Each structure stands twice: as structure tokens, then as C-alpha cells.
């Protein structure tokens, strides 16, 4: 157990404290496909109770990992990660999303619905794909991209109809469910595969409008983020919109505004201009994934937390932390690695919380980190920080 005065002095402050609960490939929940409704519910409640006991006040729950649904939808089929077969409803029937929101709220925690905007088929060789899956109904919206080990099918971000469809999916969720937030992770255009360009030449030819291809790709992502920001607020102006990007926007060598890092970047490789979205106020919070250790040679945690602190433009910035890396190398065998990273989120200006990848990392209390949270850092429960620019939820204090 690591004790620090920062834990104690921070006790009374509002802070966002959350875990990502991943459903893709059954990473966190359900533990395997085809569990009974009762087993699924029991597992989810056990996860929630663990996170609550650790002091979390929110969960970021993946409800649409691959153009599929953990809720009844007229737009996309039931997820294979629930039942083992895409399109098959849970039996006995229940609405997992409704159940999860209710259980989360019962414990005084926020529920952020996490979606992958563009991933449609996780693995084209072995994923279950239902007849009513969008990739079967509208094949012209999709492209395949990957390497010898795995090919994934994606919505083509350059096709306007694909953007509109994803917007309809989000609108439907916000309209029908009492979510506190809508959350995207780092997958916009996919991470580049060596020697292979993303196959969007036809869409570029049709919709490129004379822009350079990189610029056009960025404009496609900008356009959907702006559209979603508006759509969410039209439906429920109190619902938060957050994005958890890869931890580096740009390197200093490419842009004087960039960080002193030597890494892949959001802007140049994933075509995601996070800073623009923050500056424009299209999103309410950002969770940069700072999954490197303090002192990392190419992407130092300290360098990056300071950089993001200076580039949040008045929106909330929570730091994505990596308990899954426990014991993966010498730095992550150090029991103080995660506690020191938490301390830095509290001593660095403009940082309002932490989000942990992922839920299952806490099951075995790696390096005693659960104890550190319960007995020190999160000893006192606190509310999530207020966003004064948002409308108040009807009936809230």
C-alpha cells in the first residue's frame, strides 16, 4: 500500500474516477459469450461493486464495440459478445443497457456509454455477422483493412451516408436511455499497417473536393465529431460528450505546438485533430491515454500530462491510466508507478480525474493498487466535477 499526503489533502475535491469496461472480445464483461441472463447480471453487479469499493464514481461501458448493440436496436444487431451469435437476443430476454444504467445509478455513479464509431466487424475471418448488420445491408459504406494476422471491416469515414448512420445510432441511444455521457476511444481512422494505405481512394475521388488526402481525412472526422456534439445536445443538453484519444496529438518535430515526444500521433496517423474539437467546444472532456511510464524514452508520462494540461482549452481533461501494464516491464513492476501517476493528475493544473484501462486489471489487486485506492487516494467518495457550460439535468440538484 502506498501512502501519500496528496491522497489525504485531495479528499474533499470533486474528481472524475472511472474504469473502462470493455466488451469487445469479452475483455471485461461478460467474461465469456453465451452466459445466462442471470450470470451476466451477477458478473456486472460484482464489477460495479468492486469499482465502487475502490472509490470510483463513474464507469465507461462499451455498448457498441463493432456496429452491434448491447441493447435492443432497430439499427444494429445484438452483439455476439453477449450470446455468442450476432443478432441473437439474451435469454431470458432483458435490456442489458437499461439494466447496467439502473445498477450504476443505484450506486451513485455516472454511466458513460462507450462506442466505437467506425469499427464494424472486429475480425472478418471469424466474427459473427448477422444478416441485418449494416455491413451486409450497405456494403458500399465499408472497407476492409488489416494485416496478415487480422482484417477488420470499417465504416469508411469519407462516405457521408456512413457518418449519418453513426449519428442516428448515437441519437437513438441518447433519446432512449438515461446515459450521463457518450464516449469514444482512440479508434478513428485505424492505426496504420506498415506498407498499406487505408483503402479509401474511391471515396476520396468522389468527395475529396480538391483537398490533400490527409486534410480530407481529418475533415471527415472533424465533421462527424461536430455533428455528434450538436446531436447529443439537441436530444439532451446535459449529456456529456467525451473522447479518449491516443496520448500524443503531434510531436514537436512535426509541429511547434506538439509535445516533446517521438511517437505515432492522432493528427498525422489517425486523422483526429483533438485540439480543434476542444477549441471549438464540440466535446466536453478528453481522456488522453497516457499508458507510458514516468521517464519513458519516447513518450514520457510527465512530459505528456504537462502538455495536455496546457491544451485542454477550458474543457475537462481526465488522464487515461494503464493498470493493465502492471509487471509488464521494470518500470511497471514498481509498486509506486501508478500511485505517482495519480499524484501527478492532482498536482498538475487543469486535470480533473483519472480513467483506468481496464476493469479486469483490478480483479487481482495488481501491486496492491486496489488497496492504494481504497485506503488512500479514493478513501473518501467525491462527486464528479461539474461542467458549468452544460444544461442542468431535469430533477438534479
Which residues fall in each region the model found?
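Aromatic- and acidic-residue-enriched segments that line the glycan-binding/catalytic groove
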Residues: 69-84, 119-147, 186-209, 254-264
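Aromatic-lined carbohydrate-recognition surfaces of secreted/lumenal glycan-active proteins
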Residues: 105, 110-123, 183-187, 215-266, ...
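Extracellular glycoside hydrolase catalytic/binding regions
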Residues: 211-212, 217-224, 237-306, 328-343
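Catalytic domains of carbohydrate-active enzymes, especially glycoside hydrolases
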Residues: 42-68, 176-181, 276, 280-282, ...
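Glycine-rich, aromatic-flanked loop segments that form ligand/cofactor-binding clefts
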Residues: 13-18, 56-68, 96-146, 183-186, ...
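Active-site-adjacent "subsite" loops/lids of carbohydrate-active enzymes
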Residues: 14, 22-42, 113, 118-176, ...
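Aromatic-lined carbohydrate-binding/catalytic grooves of carbohydrate-active enzymes
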Residues: 54-91
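Substrate-binding cleft of secreted/luminal carbohydrate-active enzymes
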Residues: 271-297, 312-391
Amino acid at each position: 500500500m502506498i501512502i501519500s499526503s496528496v491522497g489525504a489533502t485531495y479528499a474533499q475535491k470533486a474528481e472524475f474516477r472511472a474504469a473502462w469496461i470493455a466488451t469487445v472480445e469479452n475483455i471485461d464483461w461478460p467474461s465469456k459469450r453465451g452466459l445466462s441472463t442471470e450470470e451476466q447480471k451477477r458478473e456486472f453487479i460484482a464489477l460495479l461493486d468492486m469499482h465502487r469499493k475502490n472509490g470510483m464514481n463513474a464507469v465507461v461501458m462499451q455498448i457498441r464495440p463493432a456496429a452491434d448493440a448491447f441493447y435492443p436496436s432497430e439499427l444494429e444487431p445484438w452483439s455476439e459478445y453477449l450470446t455468442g451469435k450476432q443478432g441473437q437476443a439474451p435469454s431470458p430476454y432483458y435490456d442489458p443497457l437499461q439494466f447496467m444504467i439502473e445498477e450504476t445509478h443505484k450506486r451513485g455513479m455516472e454511466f458513460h456509454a462507450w462506442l466505437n464509431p467506425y469499427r464494424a466487424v472486429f475480425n472478418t475471418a471469424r466474427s459473427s455477422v448477422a444478416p441485418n448488420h449494416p455491413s451486409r445491408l450497405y456494403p458500399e459504406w465499408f472497407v476492409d483493412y488489416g494485416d496478415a494476422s487480422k482484417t477488420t471491416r470499417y465504416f469508411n469515414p469519407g462516405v457521408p451516408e456512413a457518418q449519418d448512420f453513426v449519428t442516428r445510432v448515437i441519437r437513438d441511444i441518447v433519446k432512449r436511455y438515461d446515459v450521463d455521457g457518450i464516449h469514444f476511444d482512440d479508434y478513428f481512422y485505424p492505426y496504420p499497417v506498415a506498407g498499406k494505405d487505408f483503402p479509401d481512394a474511391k471515396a476520396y475521388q468522389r468527395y475529396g473536393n480538391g483537398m490533400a488526402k490527409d486534410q480530407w481525412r481529418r475533415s471527415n472526422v472533424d465533421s462527424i465529431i461536430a455533428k455528434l456534439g450538436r446531436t447529443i445536445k439537441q436530444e439532451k443538453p446535459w449529456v456529456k460528450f467525451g473522447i479518449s484519444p491516443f496520448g500524443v496529438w503531434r510531436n514537436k518535430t512535426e509541429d511547434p505546438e506538439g509535445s516533446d515526444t517521438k511517437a505515432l500521433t492522432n493528427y498525422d496517423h489517425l486523422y483526429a485533430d483533438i485540439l480543434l474539437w476542444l477549441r471549438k467546444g464540440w466535446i466536453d472532456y478528453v481522456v488522453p491515454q497516457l499508458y507510458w511510464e514516468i521517464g519513458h524514452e519516447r513518450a514520457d508520462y510527465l512530459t505528456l500530462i504537462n502538455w495536455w494540461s496546457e491544451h485542454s482549452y477550458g474543457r475537462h481533461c481526465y488522464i487515461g491510466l494503464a493498470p493493465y501494464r502492471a509487471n509488464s516491464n521494470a518500470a511497471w513492476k514498481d509498486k509506486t508507478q501508478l500511485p505517482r501517476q495519480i499524484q501527478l493528475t492532482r498536482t498538475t493544473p487543469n486535470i480533473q480525474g483519472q480513467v483506468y484501462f481496464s476493469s479486469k486489471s483490478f480483479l487481482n489487486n495488481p501491486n496492491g493498487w486496489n488497496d492504494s485506492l481504497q485506503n488512500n487516494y479514493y478513501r473518501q467518495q467525491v462527486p464528479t466535477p461539474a461542467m458549468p457550460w452544460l444544461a442542468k439535468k431535469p430533477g438534479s440538484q
